[in-house]
Amino acid sequence: MMKKLTGKVAIVTGASSGIGRATALLFAQEGARVVVGARRQVELDSLVAQIKAAGGDAIALAGDVVSEVYAKALVELALQQYGRLDIAFNNAGILGEMGPSPEVSAQGFNDALQTNLTSAFLGAKYQLPVMAHQGGGSIIFTSTFVGYSFAFPGVAAYAASKAGLIGLTQALATEFGPQQVRVNAILPGAVDTPMYRQMNDSAEAQAYIANLHALKRVATPEELARSVLYLASDDSSFVTGTASLVDGGASISRS
C-alpha cells in the first residue's frame, strides 16, 4: 500500500510526549521525514532513535517554542536537512496556571498565551512563506474542546489560549488559501497524556472526565495522531480553515 506522506517533510512540535510523539511516529511510518521539536533533548533523542530503528528518517532540535529564534531555526533545519517543508504540526502546549480566575496571576495567564497561542503563530510565521513558495502545504494546530463546545471552571488561561488558535486557523487559512496552503486545527477531548494525568491525578477524577464523553473513555495519543495524519495528507486536500472536533462525543454528551 502506498504510504500517505512519501516524499513529504514535516515539523512536529511538542514531540517529546503525548499527541506530538505519537504523530511524529505515525508521520515517519507513513513516509515523511520529520523534524521534531520540544524542550527536552533526551526525549527527542529517544524519539529519533525509535523512528530510525523502524526505518524512518528524523532529526531533532530542542528549544523553547515561545522563542521566535527557535521557530525560525526549526524551519531552517528542515530546509537544510531535507530541502523542503510540506507539513507543520504546531502542537506544543501547557495547561498553564489553574484555579479560580481572580487568583490567576497575570504572568500565569500570559505563560499560557505564549506557549499555546503565540508559539503557534511564530511557527506559522516562518512555515507559511516556505510552503507558499513551494505551491502548497498543510499546517495543523492543536486546540481543544475546552472553551469551544465544553467548559470547566478553573482553566481560564488554558481555554482562552487554545480558543485563540481557532481564530488564528481561520485567519491564516483565508490568507494563504490562494497559495494552496491549508490550515486546520484539531480539537481533542480528553487524551491520555502526561498533561491529562497532571490535570486529573486521581482515579475518581479520571472516571469523571471519561464519563463526560459519549464513548465513556478518553482517547489514546495514537487516535489523535490518525486525525492529524488525515489533515496533513492529500486525503484532506479540500479541507482548510476547520476546527475539527476529535472529542469522543464530549461536545454532544450531557451525562
Give the location of each predicted region.
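Short C-terminal tail/terminal secondary-structure segment
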Residues: 95-98, 229, 240-255
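Alpha-helical segment proximal to the catalytic Tyr-Lys
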Residues: 129, 148, 174-178, 237
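The beta1-alpha1 cofactor-binding region of Rossmann-like NAD(H)/NADP(H)-dependent oxidoreductases
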Residues: 42, 62-74, 106, 222-223
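C-terminal helical subdomain
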Residues: 178, 185, 207-235, 239, ...
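Active-site helix of classical SDR
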Residues: 124, 161, 169
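Substrate-binding pocket helix/loop in short-chain dehydrogenase/reductase
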Residues: 99-101, 105-113, 209
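Conserved glycine-rich cofactor-binding loop
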Residues: 9, 16-17
